[in-house]
Structure formats: C-alpha cells, structure tokens
C-alpha cells in the first residue's frame, strides 16, 4: 500500500537526510564489495556489514542523526542486487547519484507503526499522511521514497481478508487497444484515459522552460567538455520539478485506470485470455515518410500501459481463484471471423468494423478479436475453469509459462 506523507518543513529535512544516509551507505558498500572481489575474496552481506559497522562511525559520524535502518537496508538491497545480477535478471549494480536516483530509504516492520492518518518513523517522529492505511494486518516492510516533490510511504501488509471468487467457469477474451483500453468479448468497453495526451501541452511548456534555462547556462559557461557535469541552478531545478510533477500526475492517472479495470475483471471472470503483444516491436521507429505520425502512435501505445495491464491481471486473478491465459503472439485474432472462422487476407488499422468476405458477418473490429481470444481460451480450458495444458489447444499448444499462470500457444 502506497500512501502520501504530509511532513512538516523540519520533517522534510529529516527525510532528505535519511535518504542521503542510505545513498552513502549503498555507495560505500558497493565500493567495499568491489574491493573485496578484486582482492580475491568472496564478499557477502555479512562481511560487508561487518566492515561497514566498523568504519561508519569514524567516517560518517552524522549517520547517528538518521534512523538505523536507513543505513542497514541499503546493504540488504545491495546483496539482493548482486543475486539478481548473477542470476542474469538485472545489470551490475551502479553507484547512486544525488541528482539521478530517486531518494529513498527502508524501514523494518518493528520500527514504525500507523495510527489513523499518521505514521511514526524512528528518529523523525509522527508524520501526518494524506490517508489512513487501508489494510489491517501485520506490516512486513516499509520504504519511504521522494517522487516529484512529494514523500510517499510504501508498506507491505500481510492482510488476511476475504476476496470473493469469480463465477466458476466464466471466461472472457480481452483485446487491448489505444482508443479503447480494453474491449471484452461480451461487448464491454473500458475507455483509455489517455493521460499523456491531456497533459501534452503542459509537458511541452515545462520542457521548453528546461531547454531555455539549459541554453542560458551553457551560454554563460561556454562549451562543455567531454564528461563534464554542469551545475544545476535554482531556476533550472524548479523547471525540472514542474516537469516531474506533470509526469507523476500522468503516471497516477494511468495507474488508477488500470488498477480499477483489472480489479473488476479479476473479480468477474475465472479465465481471462489476452494476446501476447510485442510492444517493443509495435513502438519501433519508422523511417522516411510517416515517421511523425508513427511517433505519435508510439506515444499512445506506451501511454496505454499494455504491459502493466497484463502484469496486474497476472497477480490479481490467482487471488480471486482465476487464471490468466496468454494467446500466442502470431494468433490472428483480428483477421479471423468470429462467426465462421475464415481468415481475411488483410485488415488495415483504419478499418474499425470487421466484415467477413465469406459469410458476410459484420462486427466491431476489437470485439471480433476479443471473441476469437475467448474461443481460443475456451478450447483449452475445462468446464470448471482450469489451466490451459499442452495438447488442449491443438496446433496452438505450448507449455505452461511459469509466473504468468498459463499460456495458450
């Protein structure tokens, strides 16, 4: 659960100090890890922690002014980062910069507590929040982050509350799009808020302001040398914060719309069938004529958040006893006639109504694709709504994909 904090000016300084201490601890631990590795040793969390505890008070006596966990959690995060690196799930950890990385620090569950619309943080004290914690249960972890001029607390809560199961055996196909975020096979349409398009003018003005201030700075300082880091003045910092606030609002609107849609779908349907969209290929740059129009389409596709829509369904459906089925990437859901099954040779993006050349059936293009996805999932789902298994889908058979629950094709 992520809630916004409402700290006093003094508490803002204390929160920024704690985030700075966490950054210092991370950078020191990463340098120590690399030093031990270059010396032929096998660094670990325990060895780096022992070296940190022995050196921190002599090198950084001001660490005592911040919560203890702000200096400990970076070491745990670094150990996790190296595990992900060696498992080839992430890149090599890098040093954190004050201007580049998001200020944050972690707090263990026994160090803070919530009481209504306020939370008690160690050393900092009681901090007001914009809303109360929605979930009741044991708090597992907490992390305070600074985003677009606001402080947030993210708390993981072990909640044991009842989630109603979806009707048994219900199945739906979903076609994702730009104009309409999701079209369901039963005809339901979920509108796309298009948050980025509504904020384009404000974002354009903010970026112009940043560009003007950077040009003025570079004119005063002369040509920049290779690798030189230019200072950021107060006016430039204010302009960057204005742009960051616009981006944060766009992200919040998009996240809110997707959360509401996926929660309603997960509580209504037992089996949900999505197509495996190749977003990176869909948003590849065009060359020559039409590249400006393609750039606008790319922005709209990325603004819709197809990947986030699928990610949320993947973890919400099992909570309601449901299953997510992912159709094969090259399954022609838009070109197949949902009435007779005949595939059209071509279908342009401008054709919003599907008309079958064989049987004459006419239907909305997006709903036709959603019905085909629903039919594909029904062929591989038992009457009770179980998982799709190899062999159930004929030529579209494919092993079950771990982490996404099921894959069709």
Identify what each model region corresponds to:
Residues 30-37, 82, 86-93, 159, ...:
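Long, hydrophobic, amphipathic alpha-helical segments used as structural scaffolds
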Residues 46-147, 299:
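Acidic carboxylate diad motif detector
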Residues 1-71:
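Gly/serine-rich nucleotide phosphate-binding loop at the start of the catalytic core
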Residues 2, 77, 102, 116-118, ...:
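Broad gene-expression machinery/nucleic-acid interaction feature
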Residues 1-5, 126-131, 189-192:
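Generic detection of short hydrophobic beta-strand segments and adjacent strand-loop junctions
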Residues 13, 24, 123, 135-138, ...:
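Positively charged, helix-rich recognition surfaces that bind polyanionic ligands
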